[in-house]
Amino acid sequence: MMLDTATEAGKGTLAVTGVGIAVYSPYEIASLCAAVLTALYVGAQLITLLPKMLDSIAELRRRFKK
């Protein structure tokens, strides 16, 4: 198995027996982790606020239905 390291480094991938594995820099990995954690945090906040929002909407409907 021979690897053309200059070409593969230029592409940013490592070819091992026909399987391409992406090589990411630590900054890219940190950015991806931050994005995932932010999405999880926002999702958790929405889940916790959803019952309050639904109660508020129901209360507004009751007030203005009369």
Curated annotation (Swiss-Prot):
Biological processes, Gene Ontology terms: killing of cells of another organism
Localization: Host cell inner membrane
Topology of this chain in the membrane: Single-pass type II membrane protein
Alphabetized GO MF terms: pore-forming activity
Record topological domains on the Periplasmic side: 51-66
TM spans (from-to): 30-50
Record keywords, A-Z: Cytolysis, Host cell inner membrane, Host cell lysis by virus, Host cell membrane, Host membrane, Membrane, Signal-anchor, Transmembrane, Transmembrane helix, Viral release from host cell
Predominant cellular place of this UniProt entry's protein: host cell
Cytoplasmic topological domain: 1-29
Superkingdom of source: Viruses
Residues spanning the signal sequence: none
Function: Accumulates harmlessly in the cytoplasmic membrane until it reaches a critical concentration that triggers the formation of nanometer-scale pores (pinholes) causing host cell membrane depolarization and endolysin refolding and release into the periplasmic space. Once the pinholin has permeabilized the host cell membrane, the SAR-endolysin is released into the periplasm and breaks down the peptidoglycan layer. Determines the precise timing of host cell lysis.
The protein's name: Holin
Source organism phylogeny: Viruses, Duplodnaviria, Heunggongvirae, Uroviricota, Caudoviricetes
